[in-house]
UniProtKB/Swiss-Prot annotation:
Free-text comment about domains: The RING finger domain is required for ubiquitin ligase activity and autoubiquitination.
One Pfam family per UniProt: SH3_2
Protein known as: E3 ubiquitin-protein ligase SH3RF2
Entry comment describing in which tissues the protein is expressed: Heart (at protein level). Up-regulated in colon cancer tissues as compared to normal colon tissues (at protein level). Testis. In the heart, present in the apex, left atrium, right atrium, left ventricle and right ventricle, but not in the aorta.
Region (Interaction with PAK4): 370-459
GO cellular component: nucleoplasm; nucleus
Length: 729
């Protein structure tokens, strides 16, 4: 019988009054209240059933009571007393079926003062439920509203902070902090979804036979945690271990992994790492005699990042991740180690491809400057982001971010929030979407100088960069790309000259060595005191490349001789494979020589090096002095005009051949020339700085001049007894 039939039995068919425990059941099984039976017997002098007219021969008092009615009435009384006693139901409430009937026929239920409620203490013991700790009115249309003390039936757990529940037949969402869970929901099985393909069987079958092979989007059952970076799972009928960073666990699996993390920390201390002497990037793990299974090693965050980088650079249609033998790095050392790749044959078009953000260690007195080197053929998946600002987590489910930190986004959590994993710490959490920005959104052009460097970053020491920055941003004059070659990089300490025009200032020049790879990534310096200068495949020249040649300065026609910017070439070996060496330009506001009286002190021998000249800047460019090699690009000799610096005697009119001499280099005197004279000079004027010891040593350089060159015009400078000669027609 349904609820409505049971409720009809509570009414007397004759007087329609409510029945109680004194009601009597006749032999025909019809039940009436006792007062109605007494009135019928008094009126007719006999007792017959008012429904079927069946005669009743026994006394009214001897008739039995309806046991079903008694039980129903007892249930009503127990339900009312339970509601007043603070049970899971409020007074006057009904079961779920009663709530549905109230929506279909509310008037009939309101007319009846009784509610049919079963014994809830017996039936609700296994039902997941929670008790409200405070009043909650909700902020969104889908939120559940309740008062303090209400009992809410739990339907499912949305995440760590939200539940979906039901009260009085109304479902909605509510925060977990507003209720006290009385009976927990049944936990789903610990599962995780594969984010990438994982297969190490082809690498080394003997070493990786215990690894679990899976494909992307496979669902794996998590069994336990092996160590900090590996877990044991089951896929189908296969059981094995797999890297945790390759999967996305659900809430149950995450709790299981976190619970076992503390237990495994003591076990990982007993594991010994044996590095291979033949290979610097592979290691094996020594297994103890009593271990149950072989653990291939701690799959560190560094190895995962390198694997992600290889996946990023793979073709877009490729989903298989090429995984090399895991690099075993101690989990207690989170510093990132770049694998050596000097022998890799990388084309020059791939220069500047993405590399993980690795802050290089610098000395305490040096700050760091970040240089962005974007490549022309870089492409990243859309889920790779970089933090624009630092973000501190306000809850256990949020992710701490540091400025410049890489993040892989797993998906959208809600409006304005993203869920992702940090590429530095490996933690998974949510964070605001306005704190991150996708990297490499512009792949073929350079970022604007006002925008932050969101591309592949390397860390420089400011000892190799001037205090005002020698890296020019987006110079329109330097639009032609340079070829990328292996160039020994020189380290320069720029020193501002405070001397006046009439005094002699000194600049110090310091050299260092650092290798640069073709793929744009940098090796760390062997000593923290030796800074690394970045030279990459750039469309603009960020700094100076110095070579131990005779110093040659080029000043374009129409540019005054006032010092603005100086480019010096200095090196120790010729460029490889016949490619032109990369020469970089320091702009006017960042010049290292700030007066004509400044000088440079060289510390190396002179080695002739063939190099291609720089592209000639337009005549409207700001004042600068560019390097002009001895041979022009097209091989055509043009008119050459010279300026020679000597101490006490005027230069002879014939040519001299340079001879290296030993001794202290002297500083050139201040160059004084009017702007019209400087403007009248040819576009290939060469300034020669000669090293002299004590007095005049006769050291000059061969000058190639056209046969049409006329007599030399001499201009003598009066400063410090120095004579300046300008040969011209």
């Amino acid at each position: 019988m349904d609820d409505l039939t049971l409720l009809d039995l509570l009414e007397c068919p004759v007087c329609f009054e409510k029945l109680d425990v004194t009601a009597k059941v006749l032999p025909c099984q019809h039940t009436f209240c006792k007062p109605c039976l007494q009135r019928v017997f008094k009126a007719h002098k006999e007792l017959r059933c008012p429904e079927c007219r069946t005669p009743v021969f026994s006394n009214i008092e001897a008739l039995p009571a309806n046991l079903l009615l008694v039980r129903l009435l007892d249930g009503v009384r127990s339900g009312q007393s339970s509601g007043r006693g603070g049970s899971f139901r409020r007074p006057g409430t009904m079961t779920l079926q009663d709530g549905r009937k109230s929506r279909t026929n509310p008037r009939r239920l309101q007319a009846s003062p009784f509610r049919l409620v079963p014994n809830v203490r017996i039936h609700m013991d296994g039902v997941p439920r929670a008790k409200a700790l405070c009043n909650y009115r909700g902020q969104n249309p889908g939120d559940l509203r309740f008062n303090k003390g209400d009992i809410i039936l739990l339907r499912r757990q949305l995440d760590e902070n939200w539940y979906q529940g039901e009260i009085n037949g109304i479902s909605g969402n509510f925060p977990a902090s507003s209720v006290e869970v009385i009976k927990q929901l049944p936990q789903p099985p610990p599962l995780c979804r594969a984010l990438y393909n994982f297969d190490l069987r082809g690498k080394d079958k003997s070493e990786n036979q215990d690894c679990l092979t899976f494909l992307k989007d496979d669902i794996i059952t998590v069994i336990s945690r092996v160590d900090e970076n590996w877990a044991e799972g089951k896929l189908g009928d296969k059981v094995g271990i797999f890297p945790i960073l390759f999967v996305e666990p659900n809430l149950t699996a995450r709790h299981l992994l976190e619970k076992n993390k503390g237990r495994q920390s003591s076990r990982t201390k007993n594991l010994s790492l044996v590095s291979s002497s033949s290979r610097g990037n592979t290691s094996t793990l020594r297994r103890g005699p009593g271990s149950r299974r072989k653990v291939p090693g701690q799959f560190s965050i560094t190895t995962a990042l390198n694997t992600l980088n290889r996946m990023v650079h793979s073709p877009s249609g490729r989903h298989m991740v090429e995984i090399s033998t895991p690099v075993l790095i101690s989990s207690s050392n989170p510093s990132v180690i770049t694998q050596p790749m000097e022998k890799a044959d990388v084309p020059s078009s791939c220069v500047g491809q993405v590399s993980t953000y690795h802050p290089a260690p610098v000395s305490p007195g040096h700050s760091t400057a970040v240089v962005s080197l974007p490549g022309s053929q870089q492409h990243l998946s859309a889920n790779m982001f970089v933090a624009l600002h630092s973000y501190s987590a306000h809850g256990p489910d949020e992710l701490d971010l540091q400025k410049g930190e890489g993040v892989r986004v797993l998906g959208k959590c809600q409006d304005g929030w993203l869920r992702g994993v940090s590429l530095v710490t490996g933690r998974v959490g949510i964070f605001p979407n306005n704190y991150v920005i996708p990297i490499f959104r512009k792949t073929s052009s350079f970022p604007d100088s006002r925008s932050p460097g969101l591309y592949t970053t390397w860390t420089l020491s400011t000892s190799s960069v001037s205090s005002q920055g020698s890296i020019s941003e987006g110079d329109p004059r330097q639009s032609r790309p340079f070829k990328s070659v292996f160039v020994p990089t020189a380290i320069v300490n720029p020193v501002r000259s405070t001397a006046g025009p009439g005094t002699l200032g000194q600049g110090s020049l310091r050299k260092g060595r650092s290798s640069m790879r073709k793929n744009g990534s940098l090796q760390r310096p062997l000593q923290s005191g030796i800074p690394t200068l970045v030279v990459g495949s750039l469309r603009r020249s960020p700094t100076m490349v110095l070579r131990p040649q005779q110093f040659q300065f080029y000043q374009p026609q129409g540019i005054p001789s006032s010092p603005s910017a100086v480019v010096v070439e200095m090196g120790s070996k010729p460029a490889l494979t016949g490619e032109p060496a990369l020469t970089c330009i320091s702009r006017g506001s960042e010049a290292w020589i700030h007066s004509a009286a400044s000088s440079l002190i060289m510390e190396d021998k002179e080695i002739p090096i063939k190099s291609e000249p720089l592209p000639k800047p337009p005549a409207s460019a700001p004042p600068s002095i560019l390097v002009k090699p001895e041979n022009s690009r097209n091989g055509i000799e043009k008119q050459v005009k010279t300026v020679r610096f000597q101490n006490y005697s005027p230069p002879p009119t014939k040519h001299y051949t340079s001879h290296p001499t030993s001794g202290k280099p002297e500083q050139p005197a201040t160059l004084k020339a009017s702007q019209p004279e400087a403007a009248s000079l040819g576009p290939e004027m060469t300034v020669l700085f000669a090293h002299r010891s004590g007095c005049h040593s006769g050291q000059q350089t061969d000058l190639r001049r056209k046969s049409a060159l006329g007599k030399a015009t001499t201009l003598v400078s009066t400063a410090s007894g120095t004579q300046t000669v300008f040969p011209s027609k």
